[in-house]
Amino acid sequence: MDFRVMGLESPLFHTLQHMMDMSEDGAGDNKTHNAPTWSYVRDAKAMAATPADVKEYPNSYVFEIDMPGLKSGDIKVQVEDDNLLLICGERKRDEEKEGAKYLRMERRVGKLMRKFVLPENANTDAISAVCQDGVLSVTVQKLPPPEPKKPRTIQVKVA
């Protein structure tokens, strides 16, 4: 992906483009560098550019994530490692119609992603997701609080 096409020619994007190019071509014969991989940079960029709100209610947690231009079938909601909520999707560029060319392209295309570590009381078996007007709402129900243990009485015997 060339950031210059999108009108992004800042030094930050130039460096990012250079890092991605290095990762794709293996940076020549020097395999000892510690540059991040292209997929890591892409995921980090997607996470930084995907705004989200997290709310806590008495019985649930609600994650609201902007997913503009995506249909519900284009969005993936997963739980990994029992407590990591992963939300991702990808907005593809609209196909150009014959005779039309972009003069300016400002709407975001590419990967949208967020990861959240769920609290211990999150019920990962009770998760629902609804996408409406470009906003995804993921509701994670809370587990009921553990019942307090009742004291156990031990009978003392006389020896």
UniProtKB/Swiss-Prot annotation:
Q: Which family does it belong to?
A: Belongs to the small heat shock protein (HSP20) family.
The GO molecular function terms of this record are: unfolded protein binding
Where does it sit, as one GO cellular component term?
cytoplasm
Question: Organism source for this protein?
Answer: Glycine max
Q: Which InterPro entries match?
A: A-crystallin/Hsp20_dom, HSP20-like_chaperone, Small_HSP
Pfam families, per the entry: HSP20 (PF00011)
Would you tell me the protein name for this molecule? 17.9 kDa class II heat shock protein
Which cysteines pair up through disulfides? They are none
Record-level GO BP terms = protein complex oligomerization; protein folding; response to heat; response to hydrogen peroxide; response to salt stress
Q: What is the lineage of its organism?
A: Eukaryota, Viridiplantae, Streptophyta, Embryophyta, Tracheophyta
Q: Where is the sHSP domain?
A: 43-157
Q: Which UniProt keywords apply?
A: Cytoplasm, Stress response
Subcellular localization(s) per the UniProt record: Cytoplasm
Coarsely, its chief localization is cytoplasm
